[in-house]
């Protein structure tokens, strides 16, 4: 299907799902969003199918209670109130507010769940979320409260609370009542139709949004780590064959090969690294002890093998997060194509949480490498070329 989000300059319209590059533009370059006609049609089809289908059926969260209370029927006159109740009862977070960038990413993720056309929500909900994103209206969302096993219930409830005109938002640098900010922007609070209260609160969008931002930061860190590692080897005047293509092609890991390629690109034209064939392979060395390191220390020489797994993990994290953000992480799933509503557990967050645990390990490894490289720089007895702690003079006076 055609990409559901576009703006006047963005080539995203040609894609069939949002990419990390597009997310970067929206989050860090404030690229605006609009909903395409095809997208609006998809939302309307899903909503109208559910409206008809749910008339005489028992469907979780529409005419039943929530969680263990699903065994209890909700009478027709209380259906709308049920949707407001789940929002107000779950907006119970604690702790510091999530940074605005993470909340914006979470709203984009929730919007994309709705744009799959599997939630049965009214199109006005998607339009209002889009207005929040474009106008820089950021819901106040406390950081603590949910574990993700039943979706990011508490955090999403705080987002939902602002969509119905309640709670607080950050706007133009200030924390304010939502109602006044909506009025100032000419926006109307969302009115519930069938299941929008449950649909906004039920899913992985907050952890996915946080994951997307963290992944973007981690990718930047990795690129800096590669550049810094090349510079370290230039300082040490290392032999450059550790980053050579034949050596790294001998090991079949994509990450290792890519890191080595990036290092070769960084170092191209440098006069600071040495060629082993020019010095050690020329048959002229007769000394018993070599003055220059035949092999650099691990923290300089094993960069492709250390950052390679980090690169591979970032690739896998991107795959998982982009799959998740382009998924319907809702329950139940409303499917106009098969004319049915399916109950399951697409709100469950293990895909994202597993990947974020792995991402933490990867970033830790990256930081450990940086620490070892700093240790090399600071200790003159290790590097043999710099004064202690890289101080230029009066080293004995610098305690």
Where are these regions (language model features)?
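Conserved small/polar residues in nucleotide/adenosyl-binding loops
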Residues: 1-8, 395-399
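Conserved phosphate/anionic-ligand binding catalytic regions in large, soluble enzymes, centered on
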Residues: 58-71, 143-162, 346-370
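Active-site cavity-forming subdomains of large catalytic enzyme subunits
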Residues: 91, 95, 105-253
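Short, hydrophobic/aliphatic alpha-helical segments
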Residues: 40-58, 128-143, 185-190, 195, ...
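Glycine-rich loop at the start of a catalytic domain that most often binds anionic cofactors/ligands
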Residues: 68-83
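C-terminal catalytic subdomain
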Residues: 350-398
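Accessory "access/gating" subregions that flank catalytic or transport cores
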Residues: 234-368
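N- or domain-start disorder-to-order transition segments that initiate the globular core
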Residues: 9-56
């Amino acid at each position: 299907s055609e990409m559901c989000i576009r703006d006047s300059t963005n080539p995203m319209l040609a894609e069939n799902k949002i990419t990390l590059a597009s997310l970067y533009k929206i989050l860090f370059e404030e690229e605006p969003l609009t909903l395409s006609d095809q997208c609006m049609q998809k939302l309307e089809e899903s909503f109208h199918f559910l409206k008809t289908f749910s008339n005489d059926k028992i469907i979780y969260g529409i005419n039943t209670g929530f969680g263990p209370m699903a065994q209890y029927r909700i009478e027709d006159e209380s259906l709308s109130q049920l949707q407001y109740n789940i929002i107000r009862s779950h907006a119970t977070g604690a702790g510091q507010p999530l940074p605005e960038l993470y909340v914006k990413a979470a709203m984009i993720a929730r919007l994309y769940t709705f744009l799959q056309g599997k939630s049965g929500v009214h199109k006005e909900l998607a339009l209002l979320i889009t207005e929040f994103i474009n106008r820089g209206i950021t819901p106040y969302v406390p950081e603590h409260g949910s574990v993700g096993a039943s979706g990011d219930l508490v955090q999403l409830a705080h987002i939902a609370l602002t969509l119905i005109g309640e709670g607080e938002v950050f706007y133009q640098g200030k924390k304010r009542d939502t109602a006044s900010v909506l009025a100032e922007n000419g926006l109307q609070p969302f009115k519930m139709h069938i299941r929008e209260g449950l649909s906004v609160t039920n899913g992985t969008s907050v952890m996915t949004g946080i994951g997307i931002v963290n992944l973007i930061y981690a990718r930047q860190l990795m690129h800096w780590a590669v550049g810094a590692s090349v510079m370290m080897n230039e300082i040490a005047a290392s032999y450059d064959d550790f980053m050579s293509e034949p050596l790294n092609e001998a090991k079949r890991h994509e990450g290792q090969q890519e890191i080595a390629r990036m290092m070769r690109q960084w170092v191209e034209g440098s006069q600071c690294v040495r060629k082993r064939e020019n010095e050690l392979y020329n048959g002229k060395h007769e000394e018993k002890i070599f003055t220059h390191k035949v092999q650099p220390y691990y923290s300089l020489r094993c960069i492709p093998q250390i950052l390679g797994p980090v690169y591979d993990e970032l690739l896998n994290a991107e795959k998982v997060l982009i799959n998740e953000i382009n998924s319907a992480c809702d329950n139940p799933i409303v499917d106009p194509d098969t004319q049915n509503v399916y109950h399951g557990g697409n709100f469950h967050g293990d895909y994202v949480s597993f990947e974020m645990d792995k991402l933490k390990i990867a970033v830790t490894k990256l930081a450990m490498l940086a620490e070892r490289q700093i240790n090399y720089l600071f200790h003159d007895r290790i590097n043999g070329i710099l004064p202690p702690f890289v101080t230029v003079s009066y080293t004995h006076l610098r305690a």
